[in-house]
């Protein structure tokens, strides 16, 4: 009985550890709202909004540029002019911007995700 328990526990531990290693998501650089707010006036950074045009037109971080997540990769040539800058990518909650950050990194940009997106943003907002 003890042998069965030891074997069962060992198998469970191996399966558990394997699933943790296998499902470990790729990490991306992330900024908090507070950190992002400090960078807003830094000319070495640009903020890119990957929400829909309607969301961006309603409210957005001042001086941010808009490229919807759906069009981001196909418009990468338009973003090339920002290659020398660090890019802060944001959306409503941080999900779309996480995808956008990965796309930009894939193309060689220095990009980071604004954690929590507009839901967590405490800085200034332009309302149109």
What does each of the following model-derived ranges do?
Residues 2-34, 39, 45, 53-86, ...:
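Rhodanese-like catalytic fold shared by cysteine-dependent sulfurtransferases
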Residues 49:
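Phosphate-rich cofactor/ligand-interacting catalytic cores and adjacent structured alpha/beta frameworks
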Residues 89-91:
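Metallo-beta-lactamase
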């Amino acid at each position: 009985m003890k042998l069965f328990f030891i074997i069962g526990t060992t198998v469970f531990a191996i399966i558990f550890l394997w699933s943790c290693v296998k499902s470990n998501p790729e990490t991306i650089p992330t900024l908090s709202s507070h950190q992002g707010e400090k960078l807003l006036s830094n000319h070495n950074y640009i903020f890119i909004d990957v929400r829909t045009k309607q969301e961006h037109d309603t409210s957005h971080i001042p001086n941010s540029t808009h490229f919807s997540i759906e069009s981001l990769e196909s418009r990468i040539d338009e973003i090339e002019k920002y290659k020398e800058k660090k890019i802060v990518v944001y959306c409503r909650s941080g999900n779309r911007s996480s995808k956008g950050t990965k796309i930009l990194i894939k193309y060689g940009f220095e990009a980071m995700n604004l954690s929590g997106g507009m839901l967590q943003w405490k800085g200034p907002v332009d309302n149109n």
